[in-house]
Amino acid sequence: MDIEKIVTEVISAVRYDKKMTLSLARELSRRMTEEGEKNGNKLVIAIVDEKARPVLTEVMDGAFLVSHPVATRKAYTSVAIKMSTAKLAEEVGKGGSLEGLDTADGLIFLGGGAPLVVNGNVIGGIG
């Protein structure tokens, strides 16, 4: 699932206020759920605002219990570091530009989290 592509498409299609809104979060969640169902994935979708405060969390039927805290941490991490968690996972490894950051509390280094960027500004994150 290409989370960054979905984020870009939704942000382009939805009217936004340069800030995270519940309607934007709902549309992102709807698209992620649609994609998850199409691929047979049972997702937890966590969306936060620019300060990593929860805006929306949805749990698909049959999602793993561990998916809830993981999705929340992915959304938080993507806002805190302002990059996708997949890219971050590459950068924290030996010789990466963020080597050693993997000891920071609260961050997660698994793909599936992405910042929500509008006109160069991070307005939130999704995990």
Task: Mark where each language-model region is.
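Flexible, solvent-exposed loop/hinge segments and secondary-structure transition points
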Residues: 2-127
